[in-house]
Every structure is written in C-alpha cells, then in structure tokens.
Swiss-Prot record:
The gene is gatA. It comes from Deinococcus deserti (strain DSM 17065 / CIP 109153 / LMG 22923 / VCD115). Signal peptide: none annotated. Belongs to the amidase family. GatA subfamily. This is Glutamyl-tRNA(Gln) amidotransferase subunit A. It comes from the Bacteria. One of its GO terms (cellular component) is glutamyl-tRNA(Gln) amidotransferase complex. Coiled coil: none annotated. The active site is at 75 (charge relay system), 150 (charge relay system), 174 (acyl-ester intermediate). The keyword Phosphoprotein does not apply.
Length: 487
C-alpha cells in the first residue's frame, strides 16, 4: 500500500499496521546511501534499529505515539546519546555524546526513529555548509551550488526526500535560509520555545532549534512534540500552545506588513515570488501594506558583534583538556594552542579572534555594548510594527543558491547572505520560510526561493497556521528536485 511521504501520514500508517518502524528505517537508510553524493549526513545512528523495535513494542502495548516510526534526521550539533556529535569540526571528530538533547529525546519519546546526524557548517558558523570537516553538502537542485547553511544537511535531507522532517538550529537564519535555498519549510521558533539543552552552543542568546518539513501539518506535528518548557534550560519558556495547520479562511482579515528595508537588492525572481505571495494573500482576504524597521540596516553588524563574542566564550572550552581531540605538546600552553590551531577551521578561528577582540578592554563599549543597544532598538521597532500588523514579510534570502566557492574567499559577502534573517534572532522572534517560487538559472535549472513571515514573540502557531492557509490556496511552490522524488 502506497503511503504519502509525510510524517503525519507515515505515523498514521505505522499506527494502523500498514507499515512498520523498521521498514521505514530501512527505506530511509537506503535512500540516504543512494544519495550519498549530496553529503547530507555525516553519520548513521547505530541505535536506530533498537529505537524502531522499541516503537513497535510500545505500539503493541497500546501506546499512542504521535510520531510512530517516523524517520528523522537531526543536525550534528544536537546531542544524541551514544552517537558522535562533531559539529562539523575536526576538534570533535571522535566525540561521542553521553546524553541526549531534550528536543531529540522528545522526538524519541513521541515514537520517532533518529536515522542519523546531518552535515553542517563548522560549529554552525556559516551560510553555505561548505566549512564542515566532513566536506560540503550539495544542493540537490544543482550539485554545483550550496544548500545554504549552517543547517544545510538537515535542509537537504528533507528536500531530497531522505526523511520527511528534520531538525536544525537557527542562530541568524540557519534554518530559514537553507530552507529557502532548497525549497522546503523552515521554522525558527521564538527564543526559548524549544529547549536548547543538549544543543552545542554557538551564540547562546541567539541559538534556537527548529524543524524542516514539506508540509504545514508536519511542522505542526513536530512543534507539538518538541516545544515546551524544560527545567534544564534556564531560558526555556512556560508557554503552552497547540500548533495546527491553517485553512484558507484563516487569511481573512490578516494584516500583513512588508518590511520596506527588505525590498532593495533582491534578484528579480525573489521579488516576483514575494509579489506573487502578496497577491495570493490579498486574494485570500488579507490586507497588506509597507512598514519600516529603520535600524534593520545595522542588523548584520550588530548580529556579528554579538554572535562572535558569545562564540569566543562558548568555544573556549575546546582546549584539548576535556572535550574532543588533543594535539601533542611540551606543556599545557602548547597543547592548548596546537589543539585549537589544528582543530578549528579557518572561519571558526576568524570568529573567535574577532569576538575576543570585541570583548577586550577598551573595545567592549565601542563594539559589543553598542551592538546590544542596536539589538534593543531593533526589538522595539518590531514591537511597534506589530501594533499595526499581525505578521511581517520579507524575502528569506535576496538571492537563490549560489555556486560553491563563490563566497568562501569573501567573508563579508558570506555574512551578507543573512541580511534578511538575522534581525529576527536579535529580537528573539519566531519566523518561517515558505517555498514561494523558482529562479530559472542557466541551462534551465530551477533554483528555489523562499518568503519569510515573522510573527510577534510566542505567536509561532500563527506562522504554522499561515503556512497551512497558503497551502490551501495553492500559494506554496513545493516540488522535488529531479532524481529525488518522494518514495
């Protein structure tokens, strides 16, 4: 019997006895191995078979499992007990986690089977998934192009139909931007909505775990599982919610504000996708208008002057003494120096150096402190915009997937890839990237583009509802790349 390749349909089929967790696991592993050229995964979970058997046992005992047997891939900075967590870095190449992140454990508790770990930019520092010690991940729409980052492996796993859903992390756009460049949904929840316990830290005041999916219903399903308070995460929020995909009638009366500062510098295909989405919203009964976030022009600078100092502090623990690889040396100082020199890649070293400089005596007020003031201003400007509009909209990325190597020698150009996404993290808001169209590149290659919707804090469920409503009126441009159709 053919089952639709969504988490919702697969869980229903397993519960009804139409297929088994082991059969779905075998299928996912076979598809991952067949698509190994994409380099979406860095490892398979050796415990997955035992997880599948446990799901079958629990179902036989009468348990109701919302993710019964659903194969899931998680980013390689989300700890799963007994598996390697490398964060895409040589320094953690042999590190095996002794515990499981709360988000991953909630997936397992709900009946999901974790197939493996997804490739990523080293320590989540990048926008292309090119800096991983395991090599770059390829975009299934065009193998010469990047999938975005830093959660490129998680995005590709869903775009190429290896699994119906996956988890990534978003510090400045690392779920939304690769979702846009690979043509799937990517949701960045409100800061604190999903526990960060067990997520390897990059910038602790910005990091947030979020899901990738191919349907609004699957986003709702995952968020109902992973969201919720966790006493082991001091930033976790007590904010119960019920996520549900919306219907076309939910668009009636919705007030949508287009952020004026996001309208310049986009490719024509990105502008066309945004305009088509706005037309669909108006046809569905929503109203649209423009709104200004004046300090958005300072968001990139403020973001990196906050993220890099936090990274320099968080990554100080990787010194060869406790975690990961250790380089030989004649004394402690030499061991630490060589361990970090050989263990960290070039981009990570760059960000640690800049972050340390920004925190140093005499420069703290000029850089980090000033960036924090800009952060507060941006948050206030978003709050004012939400007094007039229910949601805000921008392109997710000003351009579609770029070629591998195109921006690696120009860090500023790579940082600018996040121009439409970083402000959301600075303000701690929820945002979603929705597949909105395609750019036609040379040779007739279709490259996905995305549109980003932003909601007030703790209104994450509104974004999932909106995604479902747009699906219902045919405004979501979701497809599979050639050679990677759903099973």
């Amino acid at each position: 019997m053919s089952v639709q390749f969504t988490a919702t349909a697969l869980a229903r089929a397993v519960t009804a006895g139409e297929t088994t967790p082991q059969a779905l696991l075998d299928q996912a592993v076979a598809r991952a191995e067949a698509a190994s050229t994409l380099n979406a995964l860095v490892s398979l979970n050796e415990q997955a078979g035992a997880q599948a058997a446990e799901v079958s046992r629990r179902l036989a005992g009468g348990e109701a499992l919302p993710l019964a047997g659903v194969p899931v891939i998680v980013k390689d900075n989300i700890n799963v007990s007994g598996t390697r967590t490398t964060c895409g870095s040589r320094i953690l190449a042999t590190y095996v986690s002794p515990y499981t992140a709360t988000a991953a454990q909630r997936l397992i508790d709900a009946g999901a089977v974790i197939v493996g770990k997804a490739n990523m930019d080293e320590f989540a520092m990048g926008s292309s998934t090119e800096s991983s010690a395991s090599g770059p991940t390829l975009n299934p729409w065009d193998l010469s192009r990047v999938p975005g980052g830093s959660s490129g492996g998680s995005a590709v796993a869903v775009a190429a139909n290896l699994t119906p859903v996956s988890l990534g992390s978003d510090t400045g756009g690392s779920v939304r931007q690769p979702a846009a460049l690979t043509g799937v949904y990517g949701l960045k929840p409100t800061y604190g909505r999903v526990s960060r316990y067990g997520l390897v830290a990059y910038a602790s005041s910005l990091d947030q775990i979020g899901p990738f999916a191919r349907s609004a219903a699957d986003l709702a399903l995952l968020m109902n599982v992973v969201a919720g308070h966790d006493p082991r995460d001091a930033t976790s929020l007590e904010a119960p919610a019920r996520f549900q995909a919306g219907a076309p009638e939910d668009l009636k009366g919705l007030r949508v504000g287009v952020i004026r500062e996001s309208l310049g510098g986009n490719t024509s295909a990105v502008d066309a996708a945004l305009n088509t989405t706005l037309e669909a919203l108006r046809a569905g009964g929503a109203t649209t208008g423009e709104v200004s976030i004046p300090d958005l022009s300072h968001a990139i600078a403020a973001y990196y002057l906050i993220a890099m100092p936090e990274a320099s502090s968080n990554l100080a623990r990787y010194d060869g003494m406790v975690y990961g690889q250790r380089a030989p040396g004649s004394d402690v100082s030499e061991v630490m120096t060589l361990t970090r020199e050989h263990g960290f890649g070039r981009e990570v070293q760059r960000r640690i150096m800049i972050g340390t400089y920004a925190l140093s005596s005499g420069y703290y007020d000029a850089y980090y402190s000033k960036a924090m003031k800009v952060r507060r201003l941006i948050a206030q400007e978003f709050s004012r915009a939400f007094q007039e509009y229910d949601v805000l909209v921008t392109p997710t990325s000003p351009f579609p997937a770029f070629r591998r190597g195109e921006k690696t020698s120009d860090p500023l150009a790579m940082y600018a890839a996040d121009v439409d996404t970083v402000a959301v993290n600075l303000a701690g808001l929820p945002a979603i990237s929705i597949p909105a169209g395609f750019d036609l590149a040379e040779g007739g290659v279709r490259l996905p583009v995305g549109v980003q919707f932003i909601a007030p804090a703790l209104k994450d469920e509104l974004l999932v509802q909106l995604a479902g409503a747009l699906e219902g009126i045919g405004a979501v441009q979701l497809d599979s790349p050639a050679g990677y159709a759903a099973p």
